[in-house]
Amino acid sequence: NGWREEVNDLSALEAAANLLSDVDSLLENHPASKDPKPGKPAGPGYGPLLRSGTALCYTAWEVYVEEALIETVEWLLENLQPQELPQAMRDWVAKESSDPWAFVGDSWRSEVLRLVRNRVDGDAQGRYGFNTASVGNVRSLYQQILGFDPLQGIRWQKKSNAAVREDISLLVQVRGEIVHKGTTPGALNLGGVRGWADFVRRLTEKFDGCLVEFRLKV
């Protein structure tokens, strides 16, 4: 994960917030940081600004999802004994690890963390890896490791859980168009990019709250 070295000293939420502040800075300081007037062509750099800002919003979400899982697993390993870990995690580790000696003494903690990092980043053979932070992939990752889907509890004022999921799917789709086709989705403007930054900021804060509650209930 290319961002891991940069976010090692930050919490998952701080890492996401830093990336979103980069989006804010980009929108405020870029020469093309005004929408074109109706009927007028966009100025130079307007399309790239929209694309880079939206891609950064998505990156903040993906980085958060990955780092928050590792952060939560680290907390569980530091605070619980093996038999107290979530059943889903114990089942998954038993299936993934082929070396019983890796769990001798206290080395089980580092072995579990290694397995989880492989699941997120991919291993040396290019297997596993968390590719896209879609609703389905996030749910699958967290259910597999923790036996818990934080997304199911996320909603806020005037934003139902279904609407949250729809917006995540749309962000993934828009980011896919930008990254894989190099195109700017037609309806995207500066307000839209700011909207994505606000959405991801709220989403990661709510997700983090769900993980805090999960820790308290384990």
Regions found by a protein language model. Give the residues of each.
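Charged alpha-helical initiation segments
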Residues: 1-55, 67-70, 78-79, 83-88
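Alpha-helical structural motif
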Residues: 9-15, 19, 85, 108, ...
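Amphipathic, Lys/Arg-enriched alpha-helical patches that create a basic surface
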Residues: 21-27, 137-177, 190-218
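Long, hydrophobic, amphipathic alpha-helical segments used as structural scaffolds
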Residues: 31-34, 64-76, 124, 179-186, ...
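Solvent-exposed, non-transmembrane amphipathic alpha-helical segments
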Residues: 36, 40, 77-93, 188-191, ...
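Short, charged/polar micro-motifs that form catalytic or ligand-binding hotspots
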Residues: 43-59, 168, 186, 190-193
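Helix-loop junctions and short alpha-helical segments
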Residues: 56-57, 64-159
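Alpha-helical transition-metal enzyme core signature, strongest for iron centers
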Residues: 57, 61-62, 171, 175
